[in-house]
Amino acid sequence: MNPEEIRQRRLQEMQAKAQAQGAANDPEAQRQMQEQQMQYEMQKQKILRQILSEEARSRLARIKLAKPQFAEQVEMQLIQLAQAGKLPVPLTDEYFKGLLDKIYEMNRPAKKEITIMRK
């Protein structure tokens, strides 16, 4: 099970528990959810520090500022690949650039082409 699936499952469990108790507006339940989210983020950052070199982490931080959703997706894929043992550790900036290109190409929408025919 990958970290994203674990996170989604925990989030669903917490939401179901909050609804069952009628505590959706309860500040304690909200605080608990925020705390669990913070723990998840800290764990993710710890793994990324182990996987990425300093330059690669810097590049990922800049990507996160410009495109947060893409950066989140890249982080999840990096963690999955590292857990599967498919990445050299620590990941160099050059290797990271290549991975970013591949991930971007996979997620890029198909190029739309318009042809104008004149009579």
UniProtKB/Swiss-Prot annotation:
The keyword 4Fe-4S does not apply. The keyword DNA-binding applies. GO terms for molecular function: DNA binding. Gene3D superfamilies: PDCD5-like. SUPFAM superfamilies: Double-stranded DNA-binding domain. GO terms for cellular component: cytosol. Keywords: DNA-binding. Residues 1-12 have a biased composition (Basic and acidic residues). InterPro entries: DNA_bind_arc, PDCD5-like, PDCD5-like_sf. Residues 1-35 are annotated as: Disordered. It holds the Pfam family dsDNA_bind. PANTHER family: PROGRAMMED CELL DEATH PROTEIN 5. Belongs to the PDCD5 family. This is DNA-binding protein MMP0157. It comes from Methanococcus maripaludis (strain DSM 14266 / JCM 13030 / NBRC 101832 / S2 / LL).
